[in-house]
């Protein structure tokens, strides 16, 4: 017998009364950055899930590689979070020991963008 499923978005609305849409998406993105896969079994880009060990293999001086990574990350985020209409992902700082990203997202029914600065540190994205 099949059990009916309730969309995750419904749970989001029921559990987060009083939390702004910006804060809700920020929390979801932080969970995404610190997980190995998203619901539905889709895997995330290796750099997002493995962080610095994977980063050491990337030529941080090559703008094409950094642009490729930003495109891959942008696509993964847009597949994961349907409330984002537009998203810009850019590398703020890239060295062999550091990686800092800047995300700017326009959410549905919101006039101000969500801006998120995120950095990989001590095995986690913060």
Swiss-Prot record:
List, alphabetically, the InterPro entries matched: Anti-adapt_IraD, IraD/Gp25-like
> Origin, by domain of life?
Bacteria
Q: Name one GO biological process term.
A: DNA damage response
Q: Where in the cell is it found?
A: Cytoplasm
Q: Does the keyword Cytoplasm apply?
A: yes
Pfam families recorded for this chain? GPW_gp25 (PF04965)
Chief place of localization: cytoplasm
Q: Does the keyword section mention Cytoplasm? A: yes
Keyword annotations for this protein? Cytoplasm, Stress response
Q: Which GO terms describe its cellular component?
A: cytoplasm
Q: Which GO terms describe its molecular function?
A: anti-sigma factor antagonist activity
Similarity comment: Belongs to the GpW/Gp25 family. IraD subfamily.
Q: How does it assemble?
A: Interacts with RssB.
* Physiological role: Inhibits RpoS proteolysis by regulating RssB activity, thereby increasing the stability of the sigma stress factor RpoS during oxidative stress. Its effect on RpoS stability is due to its interaction with RssB, which probably blocks the interaction of RssB with RpoS, and the consequent delivery of the RssB-RpoS complex to the ClpXP protein degradation pathway.
- For this entry, the protein name equals Anti-adapter protein IraD
Q: Which organism is it from?
A: Salmonella choleraesuis (strain SC-B67)
